[in-house]
Regions:
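N-terminal secretory/membrane targeting signals
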Residues: 1-31
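Hydrophobic, small-residue-rich transmembrane alpha-helices and their short perimembrane loops
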Residues: 30-274
Length: 274
């Protein structure tokens, strides 16, 4: 009989072997996007400007978008809020921060597994040079950092918005109350797009054309890995909040959608996520 560790090791080895067999069979049949070579951006022009100039101007547009998002962040942070509401929102943020730290460790463990597959596929099966493989590995980390950083920013600004929205709702004015979460969503959206585009434009502008393909492949893998892991675990995290809300109904003997239960929104969100 195998021990628990031996069974887990054997199962992982079987998974790796299956993946390698699949990759070895697919490698001769398909070309890789990592082999794409970008043209010289200075050789084409639009409206009297070279392609390089237009993309370089795009970086400034993206940076302006990032500044726009940070301005909304500062506005939300400086809004008035009751001390009790602020205390609750900060407690929620500390809980979310613990979740993000744990999730970051999990993503890095998952990345080690994915990176080993990338090394085997691109280095052994596709016969890429060492520098190309290292570029793919490096930019996969850049992609993960982009997803993870924006996720952290989103949780931080949403906990700001929660307490400020609750305090503004005491005045009974719908539009000013509605504008607060709307600003939070705009801030996250503009910052997300701006950060991702700045990285992609930097690859187009400052990385040699023959190395841009590996950079984009690594960046896409990292972004997808980070976003998928955060989304799946985030759904589980939301479901935990849903269960916590249901438990509070039992403890305090309140109905399903009782306004006295502050976990009603978490309950509704968790039900939809489930």
């Amino acid at each position: 009989m195998f021990s628990f560790v031996e069974r887990k090791t054997l199962k992982l080895a079987m998974i790796m072997a299956t993946i390698l067999v699949m990759l070895s069979g697919a490698a001769p049949a398909f070309a890789s996007e990592a082999e794409l070579v970008l043209p010289d951006l200075t050789s084409v022009s639009f409206f009297g400007m070279t392609g390089w100039t237009i993309l370089f101007l795009g970086i400034f547009v993206c940076l302006a978008g990032a500044v726009f998002g940070m301005v909304f962040y500062k506005q939300l942070r400086d809004m008035p809020v009751h001390s009790s509401m602020l205390e609750v929102s900060e407690l929620i943020y500390e809980t979310c921060k613990t979740y993000l730290q744990t999730q970051g460790k999990f993503i890095m463990l998952l990345w080690v597994f994915i990176a080993s597959i990338m090394v085997v596929y691109f280095g052994w099966l596709r016969h890429f040079s060492i520098d190309r493989v290292l570029l793919i590995i490096f930019f996969s980390l850049v992609g993960i950092a982009g997803s993870y950083g924006v996720a952290w920013f989103g949780i931080r600004i949403n906990t700001f918005a929660n307490s400020r929205t609750a305090f503004a709702a005491l005045k009974g004015k719908p539009f000013p109350t509605y504008a607060i979460p709307l600003k939070a969503g705009i801030s996250i959206g503009t910052l997300l797009i701006s950060v991702e585009l700045v990285i992609m434009l930097a690859i187009l502008l400052f990385v040699p054309g023959e190395y841009a393909g590996p950079c984009f492949i690594g960046f896409a893998i990292g972004e997808s890995l980070g976003a998928a892991a955060l989304r799946i675990a985030g759904g589980i995290f939301t479901k935990i909040a849903d269960i916590g809300s249901d438990l509070m109904k039992i403890v305090f003997d309140v109905k399903e959608d009782d306004a006295r239960n502050p976990g009603v929104i978490a309950d509704c969100t968790g039900d939809n996520a489930g």
